[in-house]
Amino acid sequence: MANLIDNTARSAASDARAARHPEKQKRADTPVLRKPDWIRVKAPLGKTFSETQKIVKDGGLVTVCEEAGCPNIGECWEQKHATFMILGDTCTRACSFCNVKTGLPAAVDTDEPRRVAEAVAQMGLNHVVITSVDRDDLDDGGAQHFVDVIEAIRAATPSTTIEILTPDFLRKPGAAEAVIDARPDVFNHNLETVPRLYLSIRPGARYFHSLRLLERVKDRDPAQFTKSGIMVGLGESKEEVMQVMDDMRSAGIDFLTIGQYLQPTRKHAAVDRFVHPDEFKAYETIARAKGFLMVSATPLTRSSHHAGDDFAKLRAAREQMMARG
């Protein structure tokens, strides 16, 4: 086993050269907590990992696995699972928790839907997760591109189930509806944190707008599964987490994910504490009691981790619920 790759150890000179986060360079370094023993992952090695890496590279594609520094990349890529990040590698937002590059994005690549669909077919995916950067520069926030990708995958591999993890489409009238009408199997949009921390952690977003986005999915297509997640370890209280759960259930959200926040670099928000695995188990118990069909709550839980297996469980849970009447 190997510890997580620690990007926080990079020097200031290295950060400046990389310039992934130009808006963060003037921020003071934040303290870095030593990771506990329970946060351990396998090093990304093996033939299948390399094969997945080659498919992504040859297709000129971007994955959130790489861009966000996901700790589960070794496990997922060894199983030929990858989360494709469309609409480029540059985000128009500057959330203090996120490792994705920020700045002025390039023009939309209209050939990307074809290449994503081709990669899905090459990898033999039964379930695929598609996410994107925020594209506040586009009139529709990138909604039509999501639709194009969904349609391309359905044309190439009709049996593949599709999960999308979308931006909030803030101030983009009709954008969310266009994506909902493309009928992905799972519509995911992460609330990320509790309302009190939005200004410091997710300053470009609005908590109740994000919540309403997920509610609109259910209003427009009640059969569509909805999913959302939060990070813990940012300074939230247990009571605040439980209130978020209640808000999500009021919006009809089916699937909740809760994972430990991990600090990408010293210029990002600091970890307030590492939440013990027993606390995650308690959160899972509480969430299930509140009526979520599916809950994943562990230190290394991420939105797309085990997404295919979880989708099968989610669908089975709904069928059981309907059978009970």
Swiss-Prot record:
Compartments (UniProt record): Cytoplasm
Cellular component GO terms held in the UniProt record: cytoplasm
Keywords carried by this UniProt record: 4Fe-4S, Cytoplasm, Iron, Iron-sulfur, Metal-binding, S-adenosyl-L-methionine, Transferase
Stretches assigned to the Radical SAM core domain: 77-293
Annotated EC: 2.8.1.8
Molecular function terms, GO-annotated: 4 iron, 4 sulfur cluster binding; lipoate synthase activity; metal ion binding
Catalysed reaction equations from the record: [[Fe-S] cluster scaffold protein carrying a second [4Fe-4S](2+) cluster] + N(6)-octanoyl-L-lysyl-[protein] + 2 oxidized [2Fe-2S]-[ferredoxin] + 2 S-adenosyl-L-methionine + 4 H(+) = [[Fe-S] cluster scaffold protein] + N(6)-[(R)-dihydrolipoyl]-L-lysyl-[protein] + 4 Fe(3+) + 2 hydrogen sulfide + 2 5'-deoxyadenosine + 2 L-methionine + 2 reduced [2Fe-2S]-[ferredoxin]
Biased composition annotated in UniProt, kind: Basic and acidic residues: 17-31
Functional pathway: Protein modification; protein lipoylation via endogenous pathway; protein N(6)-(lipoyl)lysine from octanoyl-[acyl-carrier-protein]: step 2/2
Cofactor remark from the record: Binds 2 [4Fe-4S] clusters per subunit. One cluster is coordinated with 3 cysteines and an exchangeable S-adenosyl-L-methionine.
Pfam families: LIAS_N, Radical_SAM
Annotated segments matching region Disordered: 1-31
Origin superkingdom: Bacteria
Protein name listed in UniProt: Lipoyl synthase
Organism lineage string: Bacteria, Pseudomonadati, Pseudomonadota, Alphaproteobacteria, Maricaulales
